[in-house]
Amino acid sequence: MTRFQRVAVLGSTGSIGDSTLDVIARHPDRLGVYALSAYSRMDKLAAQAAACGAAVVVVPDDAAAARFRAAWRGKAAMPEVRVGPRALAETAAAPECTTVMAAIVGAAGLPAALAAAQAGKRVLLANKEALVAAGSLFMAAVRENGAELLPIDSEHNAIFQCMPQGARAAAPTAPAPGVRRLLLTASGGPFRRQDPADLHEVTPAQACAHPNWSMGRKISVDSATMLNKGLEVIEAHWLFAMPSERIDVLIHPQSVVHSMVEYDDGSVLAQLGQPDMRTPIAYGLGFPERLASGVGLLDLTRWGRLDFEQPDLQRFPCLALSFAALRAGQPACVALNAANEVAVAAFLEGRLRYTWIARVIEAVLEWQAKQASVTLTSLDDVLDLDARARSFAGNLGLA
């Protein structure tokens, strides 16, 4: 049996955080909560901390700390309240913590995820930006500090499970022997069948209505545009040392097959399961053993059929832009992610039309390509380029 794990759940009030706490609560003999963090929902954070007995909570500023203290209704002593990004990174690296669930959405989660890797933690990676914006830095930190890296995105977790047993290295430097290509599946989101000409009038509520998964608003929009899948292609490149030409995307509307690995002999291994994030979370927490997740049985007779099709890049230009960014290099991936975060925020606030999300990304990628050559050798380099890309996106007049 693996050692008892004390988990820091970064981004605990989101959907991944909820699912993580659900799995942890099912295994009190093996798992406990060391720390929680949240950005805005202090009432929920207080309730979570009281329920799981967290020793530490991390909030963004003093105002949030005051709201947390006012919301505290726990019978036990209030947890230590830490404030700010530096406290978040220090908590992720704390010696009392063995495992970090990196589930903060966006580039804001990057420093803490990197700190966890540098401290040699088991990192359950649900934050895409750690690899999209800083893949080389992050993977080097994993290798150099003996960290364990377990992907939590359902697609990458599926690929991880389908890889050769001896090839599940924490940070490979070359593709696994015998693996021909990776096949990432995508539901196609709510607009899979919609005429591209009609997408101009899409509302935030429509874009957030994912047909299969329960997710936060930002990632739901990313799923609708398939930018989310593009980010996952970039992640797969770093996680499995796989070149872009050996990574393919398939639309699979049922979301039962979570991804596949094709081998040189023609064999294809697929991981199937319910569209429930507790499955990959339990896998990451229990690895190399299996933990009960609370997910029900998969009844394939209920589905009757499983469909697959090629993505329409006219309907999903963000996917094509993501492949282009990966081929262009790490600075382009930083710009891609920054532009998307700015554009999606503007869309959700009603300041940007849905179809202009891709336009903003394309404009920022064109801007980045014209910049002087950039070498990203530190987190500060990444964050500087991220800030400049966000500034350019925000000044386009579209956002």
Swiss-Prot record:
Enzyme class, one word?
A: oxidoreductase
Question: Which InterPro entries does this one have?
Answer: DXP_reductoisomerase, DXP_reductoisomerase_C, DXP_reductoisomerase_N, DXPR_C, DXPR_C_sf, NAD(P)-bd_dom_sf
Q: What is its EC number?
A: 1.1.1.267
Q: Where does 1-deoxy-D-xylulose 5-phosphate bind?
A: K128, S154, E155, S187, H210, S223, N228, K229, E232
Q: What GO MF terms are annotated?
A: 1-deoxy-D-xylulose-5-phosphate reductoisomerase activity; manganese ion binding; NADPH binding
UniProt keyword list: Isoprene biosynthesis, Manganese, Metal-binding, NADP, Oxidoreductase
Kindly list the cofactors needed.
Mg(2+); Mn(2+)
Xref: Pfam families: DXP_redisom_C, DXP_reductoisom, DXPR_C
As its record notes, the protein acts as a catalyst of: 2-C-methyl-D-erythritol 4-phosphate + NADP(+) = 1-deoxy-D-xylulose 5-phosphate + NADPH + H(+)
Record carries keyword Ribonucleoprotein? no
Gene Ontology biological process terms in this record: isopentenyl diphosphate biosynthetic process, methylerythritol 4-phosphate pathway involved in terpenoid biosynthetic process
The protein's annotated pathway: Isoprenoid biosynthesis; isopentenyl diphosphate biosynthesis via DXP pathway; isopentenyl diphosphate from 1-deoxy-D-xylulose 5-phosphate: step 1/6
Binding-site list for Mn(2+): D153, E155, E232
Do the record's keywords include Oxidoreductase?
yes
Specify which residues bind NADPH according to the UniProt entry for this protein: T13, G14, S15, I16, N127, E129, G216
Per the similarity annotation, which family is this?
Belongs to the DXR family.
Which PANTHER family does this entry report, sorted A to Z? 1-DEOXY-D-XYLULOSE 5-PHOSPHATE REDUCTOISOMERASE (PTHR30525), 1-DEOXY-D-XYLULOSE 5-PHOSPHATE REDUCTOISOMERASE, CHLOROPLASTIC (PTHR30525:SF0)
Q: State the function annotated in the UniProt record.
A: Catalyzes the NADPH-dependent rearrangement and reduction of 1-deoxy-D-xylulose-5-phosphate (DXP) to 2-C-methyl-D-erythritol 4-phosphate (MEP).
Q: What is this protein called?
A: 1-deoxy-D-xylulose 5-phosphate reductoisomerase
